[in-house]
């Protein structure tokens, strides 16, 4: 409402997750929430386009290094689901993408930057920042 009232246009970039596109073990709640977030972004893109408000989504895969999500029970749950130790999580996540890269917070920031500073005619779109997870390729 505020952005519409200001009549300046603008950008909304939501951070969702690769898990909204592809399923994983023991992940129903999180995956469902992220899929809903991605669809909400597309709906808002259509709804707000006449106001020149662009809505896009950045989809990271597991950002293990530098993310507080791994400090709680989440890391233990993910490690258990994959049958590995918590210490093995960064390498495990890197090996499951085709570039074999660990995804860092600055990689997500680069995705946001691309929407804000470069892709100025983009709305309703998704950039995956996941090192290439074929099952999560946007179709």
Model-identified regions with their sequence ranges:
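Active-site loop-to-helix junction immediately N-terminal to the catalytic Tyr of the SDR YXXXK motif
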Residues: 23-31, 43
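Hydrophobic alpha-helix immediately C-terminal to the catalytic Tyr-X-X-X-Lys motif of short-chain
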Residues: 36, 40-44, 48, 58
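Residue(s) in the substrate-gating loop at a strand-loop-helix junction
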Residues: 17
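Short, small/polar-rich loop/turn modules that mediate ligand/substrate recognition or access, typified
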Residues: 49, 54, 122-124
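Active-site helix of classical SDR
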Residues: 8, 33, 41
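Alpha-helical segment proximal to the catalytic Tyr-Lys
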Residues: 1, 5, 46-47
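C-terminal substrate-recognition "lid" of short-chain dehydrogenase/reductases
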Residues: 99-129, 134
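A glycine/serine/threonine-rich, flexible loop-to-helix segment
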Residues: 63-96, 138-139
């Amino acid at each position: 409402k505020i952005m519409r009232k200001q009549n300046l246009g603008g950008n909304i970039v939501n951070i969702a997750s690769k898990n909204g596109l592809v399923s994983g073990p023991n992940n129903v709640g999180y995956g469902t929430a992220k899929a809903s977030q991605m669809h909400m972004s597309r709906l808002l893109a259509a709804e707000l386009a006449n106001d020149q408000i662009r809505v896009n989504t950045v989809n990271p895969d597991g950002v293990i290094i530098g993310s507080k999500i791994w400090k709680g029970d989440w890391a233990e749950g993910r490690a258990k689901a994959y049958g590995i130790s918590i210490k093995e999580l960064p390498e495990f996540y890197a090996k499951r993408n085709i570039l074999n890269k660990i995804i860092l917070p600055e990689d997500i920031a680069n995705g946001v930057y691309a929407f804000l500073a470069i892709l100025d005619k983009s709305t309703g779109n998704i950039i995956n920042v996941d090192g290439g997870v074929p099952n999560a390729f946007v179709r």
